[in-house]
């Protein structure tokens, strides 16, 4: 379990976490957001296993400049059950990110309160390409026959490669 910072409502005061940590939190009348900062040393897939004991919730992922790159919303529970479980697999590039968990519906910003548990994990993609390779000018040089491992992520739409043929 990760102890949350007393005031983690901003990115500057976000609780630092590692993939593999379990996040236990609550959204209250006076605490709208819980922000967590994490770092990936390589490109890969983060998995978020969310169990929410509130009528609905929203998870957002941001880059360090504040750009939102992924979100989930419309996660409304079955009132008879009293909770909702979801699993998300999000492919990201190497870097530092913020996860924000809140009790707002994205489309109308109605707020609810409640508890949640979010288990995190990470699987490296083992990419062999060099980033930034999103243009012809920055393309990765390859040789015919090379094994290439790349990844298309929520924050990286392209991997570009170039090669030369010596015979026609």
Model region roles, listed by residue range:
Residues 25-27, 54-84, 104-107, 151:
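Surface-exposed beta-strand/loop patches in noncatalytic accessory domains
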Residues 1-17, 34-36, 61-68, 88, ...:
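C-terminal edge strands of extracellular/lumenal beta-sandwich accessory domains
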Residues 45, 56-58, 115-117:
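Exposed beta-strand and adjacent loop surfaces of beta-rich binding modules
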Residues 19-47, 83-88, 98, 146-168:
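Non-catalytic, beta-strand-enriched accessory regions in extracellular/secretory proteins
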Residues 49-50, 109:
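Short consensus segments that form the blades of beta-propeller domains
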């Amino acid at each position: 379990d990760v102890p949350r910072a007393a005031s983690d409502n901003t990115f500057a005061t976000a609780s630092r976490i590692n993939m593999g940590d379990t996040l236990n939190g609550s959204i209250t009348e006076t605490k709208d957001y819980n922000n967590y900062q994490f770092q990936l040393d390589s490109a890969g897939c983060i998995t978020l296993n969310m169990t929410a004991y509130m009528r609905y919730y929203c998870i957002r992922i941001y880059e360090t400049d504040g750009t939102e790159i992924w979100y989930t919303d419309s996660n409304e529970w079955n009132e008879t059950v009293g909770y909702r479980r979801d699993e998300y697999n999000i492919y990201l590039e190497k870097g530092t990110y913020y996860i924000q968990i809140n009790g707002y519906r994205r489309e109308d910003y109605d707020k609810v309160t409640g508890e949640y548990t979010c288990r995190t994990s990470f699987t490296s993609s083992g990419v062999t390409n060099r980033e930034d390779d999103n243009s012809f000018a920055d393309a990765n040089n390859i040789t015919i026959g090379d094994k290439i491992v790349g990844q298309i992520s929520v924050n990286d739409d392209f991997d570009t490669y170039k090669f030369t043929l010596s015979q026609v």
